[in-house]
Design a protein with these regions (language model features):
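Extended terminal
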Residues: 1-10, 58
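Beta-propeller and related beta-repeat scaffolds in trafficking/envelope systems
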Residues: 43, 55, 80-82, 89, ...
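Hydrophobic membrane-insertion alpha-helices, especially the h-region
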Residues: 6-22
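Outer-membrane beta-barrel architecture
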Residues: 101-105, 158-164
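Flexible, solvent-exposed coil segments and beta strand-coil junctions
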Residues: 66-69, 122-131, 163-170, 188-190
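Extracytoplasmic/ectodomain regions of membrane proteins and secreted proteins
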Residues: 41, 140, 153-161, 171-174
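Extended, amphipathic, non-transmembrane alpha-helical segments
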Residues: 114-123
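Terminal hydrophobic membrane-targeting helix
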Residues: 19-115, 135-136, 140-142, 146-152
Length: 190
């Protein structure tokens, strides 16, 4: 009887470990959370519409949390849209269970997008005089990149963010005397 209970206990532990490893490598794809995620985004800013097909949920063994990967994300802001290459979030299970702010980090990737289109989207999300000036100075160009940000317990963005990317075919006119044309450059903001 003791051998049988021991074997059952070992099988249960091994099956749970297998399940955790499966969730950490393959995860679960679902459309169940799509409307919830879209509603949360609209609650932050009613002008933003996030479109995507599926959500993939993975277990993060190192942080004892969840990784949320949104498949084929596209952001629309007042008729202007941009395709994102990735949209991933890290969520703390402990904070989620305590009903606290659970978002730990976010990773946003942008496919090659027209720089004026991106400025228009950002300006509609968070208006800034700098963006209005930049829209007049920047004549054309493409931008792509990845942003990694971390959040504190209250939901504010921490200062340890990292933005990397590439600007290509960039043209600008500063005042009437200075022109930049066909500039290709990598950038990194830390």
């Amino acid at each position: 009887m003791i051998k049988w209970i021991t074997r059952l206990f070992i099988v249960l532990i091994l099956s749970q470990l297998f399940f955790l490893f499966f969730l950490s490598f393959y995860g679960v794809e679902t459309t169940y959370f799509n409307s919830t995620i879209q509603e949360k985004v609209r609650a932050l800013n009613p002008n933003i519409n996030l479109e995507f097909q599926k959500t993939k949920i993975l277990f993060d063994i190192k942080q004892l949390g969840l990784k949320i990967k949104i498949r084929n994300p596209k952001i629309n802001v007042k008729g202007t849209s941009a395709n994102l290459s990735k949209l991933n979030f890290g969520i703390s299970i402990e904070s989620l269970l305590k009903d606290e702010f659970a978002l730990q980090n976010g990773e946003f990737g942008l496919f090659k997008t027209d720089i004026k289109q991106l400025i228009k989207i950002i300006n509609q999300i968070k208006p800034s005089p700098f963006l209005i000036i930049a829209k007049k100075i920047f004549k054309e160009g493409k931008i792509e990149g990845v942003a990694e940000i971390n959040f504190d317990n209250t939901g504010k963005i921490q200062d340890d963010y990292k933005i990397t990317g590439l600007v290509s075919d960039f043209n600008a006119k500063i005042l009437k005397k200075f022109r930049l044309s066909q500039i290709d450059s990598n950038f990194e903001l830390i």
